[in-house]
Curated annotation (Swiss-Prot):
The keyword Protein biosynthesis applies. The keyword Phosphoprotein does not apply. One of its GO terms (molecular function) is translation release factor activity, codon specific. Methylated by PrmC. Methylation increases the termination efficiency of RF1. The modification N5-methylglutamine is found at residue 237. NCBIfam families: prfA (TIGR00019), PRK00591.1 (NF001859). This is Peptide chain release factor 1. Peptide chain release factor 1 directs the termination of translation in response to the peptide chain termination codons UAG and UAA. The gene is prfA. Keywords: Cytoplasm, Methylation, Protein biosynthesis.
Length: 361
């Protein structure tokens, strides 16, 4: 391991001890924001400190085993050889683990997200598939203990959605869903198809980290136009009786957001403003990613919504992620929310991309 990496790890251990002490101070405990931020930092540092301590112990074990090789007792020498082998394996494993842990963190990884699914080419079938994708993500969220709430929805004429926007909140939501942005293509025989022909339809998915106050996304009230309108769709007796739905237009960028799912105009406005901030934050992220891709090609992290990222082929029971050439013949499981078999390879590919970038620098 390079001396520069060891020095960085040593400074992180010192910071871990410092944060641990701060978390027990009365002034920090009484300040919810500071306590929350320091708790997050502590939980991020904890696995790094644990792995480095194990790495240091493995180095000591290796040194002790080397010294035992000089023993005259043949049995002790054999034992030393075995311990040396185990220590070398542990060192190699922990060095790789520490490399991953030291990769630059995406500051939005812990964020909640807005998930936007829109029907693209394919008419009614695209709307139906939007509904299928929403169910898939809802089941995945449930499996991970996340919560999901619908912000606004425009239903398709024969089921599904022309567009549905939801908020997903829980631990590490953005870190797992950020690679889902892009065009999702489906190949199957629609229920309305009498000739049994396979149709190709598409939906676009956008995953945006929820922007809270710490992101520094400030919106000038003079830059927005707010309209009220009557909510439509499912929602019980309350729907259509009041102009509770909100549409906000951000004049400088032309970004438009709507919220009609909450039961009061005040709540809809608050949700719409949060969504607008998140869209503006995502625009900044997209801009940064484009600048990075001008200098290096990232297979996974481009987030381009027009890029076809995945195909769901029903006749073959196949899912293919085109960015990493991953093909799985477990479509039914994936549509039931078993997304880790796709998401984890994407995360690993992204980590490999970051490692390659670090080695180039």
């Amino acid at each position: 391991m390079k001396d520069s990496i060891k020095a960085k790890l040593q400074s992180l251990i010192e910071r871990h001890e410092e944060v641990s002490a701060l978390l027990s101070e009365a002034g920090i405990i009484s300040d919810q924001n500071k306590f929350r931020d320091l708790s997050k930092e502590y939980s991020h540092l904890e696995p790094i400190v644990k792995a480095f301590k194990e790495y240091t112990q493995a180095l000591e074990d290796k040194q002790a085993a080397y010294e035992m090789l000089n023993e005259k007792d043949a049995e002790l020498v054999e034992m030393a050889k075995e311990e040396l082998k185990l220590a070398n394996e542990a060192i190699e494993k922990l060095e790789s683990e520490l490399q991953i842990l030291l990769l630059p963190r995406d500051p939005n990884d812990d964020a909640n997200v807005f998930l936007e699914i829109r029907a693209g080419t394919g008419g009614d079938e695209a709307s139906i598939f939007s509904g299928d994708l929403f169910k898939m993500y809802s089941k995945y969220a449930e499996q991970r203990g996340w919560k999901i709430e619908v912000i606004s929805a425009s239903e398709g004429e024969h089921g599904g959605y022309k567009e549905i926007i939801s908020r997903i909140y829980g631990d590490g939501v953005y870190s797992q869903l950020k690679f889902e942005s892009g065009a999702h293509r489906v190949q199957r025989v629609p229920a309305t198809e009498s000739q049994g022909r396979i149709h190709t339809s598409a939906c676009t998915v956008a995953v945006m980290p929820e922007a809270d106050e710490v992101e520094g996304i400030d919106i000038n009230p003079a830059d927005i136009k707010v309209d009220t309108f009557r909510a439509s769709g499912a929602g019980g007796q309350h729907v259509n009786k009041t102009d509770s739905a909100i549409r906000i237009t951000h004049i400088p960028t032309g970004v438009v957001v709507e919220c009609q799912d909450q039961r009061s105009q005040h709540k809809n406005r608050a949700a719409a403003m949060l969504m607008l901030k998140s869209k503006l934050l995502q625009a900044e992220i997209d801009k940064q990613q484009k600048e990075q891709s001008d200098t290096r090609k990232s297979l996974v992290g481009s987030g381009d919504r027009s890029e076809r990222i995945r195909t769901y082929n029903y006749p073959q029971g196949r899912v293919t992620d085109h960015r990493i050439n991953l093909t799985l013949y477990k479509l039914d499981e994936v549509m039931e929310g078993s997304l880790d078999s796709i998401i984890q390879p994407l995360v690993l590919e992204h980590q490999a991309d970051l490692l390659a970038t670090m080695s180039d620098e």
